[in-house]
């Protein structure tokens, strides 16, 4: 195999074959590298070998099959010698006693330990996992070899992963310039966006800043929603008009923030400093939105004389049109509804796996007092009059609580529903 660019990197070992690792490994294999994909989950490895992906992502199955059929991608449960190693494992958050959270580096450091026996002088390690500042240097310091280490944080959106892997700009921070340049050589094989070179601390901080910026702006929208609920203003109408200002772009409110990035990453800044009070306040506000939704739903039902209701949850995933339920606000909304005596059924046309039982649509709505929309799936947006007419006879009470403002409310109202919208103080 011919070498790529200025550095003799021919073989790459990708550790972690989840939402980021598998697309990255497959992309590299389809661009001429010899790639070994490693995951400790044997069932996942076997599924990949058999072309049975548990990740719902446009184009991914075709990409993976192409990589495997080309013989450039092999997947297995253990690492082996390579010229470069890319770590794509989760970095979950651990909760502290005060309710704050910190980064759990267990998976990252386990991946490092797994590749140490196979490292040779001159090898490169790239960490794609989101990590707190100074972690890349910490990894380098744990390895007693003359190697190169860089951080190239993933920046893709579920549902558009393959498109964004290619088109998005990337940032690469190295422990030294050569580390960053070596990593750039790998990524420029398929990245069409610009690749920016910096130091590892800056790269770590940039990724956290990106997601913190979004989290804070969502928190602002959620706070506006709570205020508008209180004073009788429709927050969605107010936001739409406010955004007519050329320098204003308020985001939409919702039942909370989910996914493995935005709801987690700001805590990695908070754990490093006492100067992140604003960031922490925003994170706590968003974390408390499921409780606010639960309280609002039960309060409105109580006003109508409905106690211990059966509630139909529409949406288990953290965002629309994906199967990913990680950190989904739906989990906490359901948990709190159950704790307050409600009976809950959940329907999601995309999710296969969830902490609570998933029902068919008919099972979910049978005998229901209230439908609560928590996820903006197209399947929910596209509910039309005929669909509503089919739903009506199966319900006990015609009540809808829309936290995403995606339903055609007039259709539901014409069918006799009471429709409550998050951030609108009146029915």
UniProtKB/Swiss-Prot annotation:
Swiss-Prot/TrEMBL GO biological process terms: polysaccharide biosynthetic process
UniProt-listed InterPro entries: 6-PGluconate_DH-like_C_sf (IPR008927), NAD(P)-bd_dom_sf (IPR036291), UDP-Glc/GDP-Man (IPR017476), UDP-Glc/GDP-Man_DH_C (IPR014027), UDP-Glc/GDP-Man_DH_C_sf (IPR036220), UDP-Glc/GDP-Man_DH_dimer (IPR014026), UDP-Glc/GDP-Man_DH_N (IPR001732), UDP_ManNAc/GlcNAc_DH (IPR028359)
Residues reported to bind NAD(+): 19-20, 39, 44, 91, 130, 326
Binding locations of UDP-N-acetyl-alpha-D-mannosaminouronate: 155-156, 207, 211, 214, 245, 247, 258, 318-319, 404
A Pfam family reported for this protein in Swiss-Prot or TrEMBL: UDPG_MGDP_dh_C
Keyword Oxidoreductase among UniProt keywords: yes
Coiled coil segments of this chain: none
Single GO term (MF): oxidoreductase activity, acting on the CH-CH group of donors, NAD or NADP as acceptor
Catalytic activity as recorded in UniProt: UDP-N-acetyl-alpha-D-mannosamine + 2 NAD(+) + H2O = UDP-N-acetyl-alpha-D-mannosaminouronate + 2 NADH + 3 H(+)
Keywords for the protein's UniProt record, in alphabetical order: NAD, Oxidoreductase
EC number: 1.1.1.336
UniProt-annotated catalytic positions: 207, 261
Enzyme class: oxidoreductase
UniProt xrefs under NCBIfam families: NDP-sugDHase
Function: Catalyzes the four-electron oxidation of UDP-N-acetyl-D-mannosamine (UDP-ManNAc), reducing NAD(+) and releasing UDP-N-acetylmannosaminuronic acid (UDP-ManNAcA).
Family: Belongs to the UDP-glucose/GDP-mannose dehydrogenase family.
Description of how the protein assembles with itself and partners: Homotetramer; probably dimer of dimers.
Record protein name field: UDP-N-acetyl-D-mannosamine dehydrogenase
Provenance organism: Methanococcus maripaludis (strain C7 / ATCC BAA-1331)
């Amino acid at each position: 195999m011919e070498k790529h660019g200025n550095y003799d990197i021919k073989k790459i070992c990708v550790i972690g074959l989840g939402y980021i690792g598998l697309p990255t490994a497959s992309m590299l294999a389809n661009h001429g590298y010899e790639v070994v994909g490693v995951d400790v989950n044997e069932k996942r490895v076997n599924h990949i070998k058999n072309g049975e992906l548990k990740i719902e992502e446009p184009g991914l199955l075709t990409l993976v099959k192409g990589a495997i059929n080309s013989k450039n991608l092999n997947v297995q449960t253990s690492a082996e010698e390579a010229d470069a190693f890319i770590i794509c494992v989760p970095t979950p958050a651990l909760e502290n006693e005060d309710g704050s959270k910190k980064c759990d580096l267990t998976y990252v450091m386990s991946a490092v330990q797994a590749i140490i026996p196979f490292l040779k002088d001159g090898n490169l390690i790239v960490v794609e996992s989101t990590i707190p500042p100074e972690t890349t240097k910490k990894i380098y310091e744990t390895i007693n070899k003359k190697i190169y280490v860089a951080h190239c944080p993933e920046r893709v959106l579920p549902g558009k992963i393959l498109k964004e892997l290619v088109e998005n700009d990337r940032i690469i921070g190295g422990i030294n310039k050569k580390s960053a340049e070596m990593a750039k050589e790998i990524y420029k094989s398929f990245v069409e966006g610009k690749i920016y070179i910096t130091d590892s601390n800056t790269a770590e901080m940039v990724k956290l800043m990106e997601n913190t910026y979004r989290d804070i702006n969502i928190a602002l929208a959620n706070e506006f929603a709570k205020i508008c609920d209180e004073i009788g203003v429709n927050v969605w109408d107010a936001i739409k008009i406010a955004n007519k200002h050329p320098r204003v772009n308020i985001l939409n409110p919702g039942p909370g923030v989910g996914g493995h990035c935005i709801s987690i990453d700001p805590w990695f800044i908070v754990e490093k400093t006492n100067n992140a009070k604003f960031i922490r306040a925003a994170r706590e506000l968003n974390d408390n939105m499921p409780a606010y939704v639960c309280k609002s739903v039960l309060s409105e039902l109580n006003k109508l004389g409905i106690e211990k209701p059966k509630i139909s949850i529409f949406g288990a995933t953290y965002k629309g049109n994906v199967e990913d339920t990680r950190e989904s606000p739906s989990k906490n909304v359901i948990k709190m509804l159950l704790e307050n005596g409600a009976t809950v059924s959940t329907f999601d046309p995309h999710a296969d796996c969830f902490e609570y039982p998933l029902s068919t649509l008919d099972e979910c709505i049978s005998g229901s007092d209230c439908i609560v929309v928590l996820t903006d799936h197209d399947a929910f947006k596209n509910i039309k009059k005929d669909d509503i007419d089919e739903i009506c006879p199966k319900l006990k009470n015609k009540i809808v609580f829309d936290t995403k403002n995606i339903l055609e409310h007039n259709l539901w109202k014409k069918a006799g529903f009471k429709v409550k919208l998050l951030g609108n103080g009146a029915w």
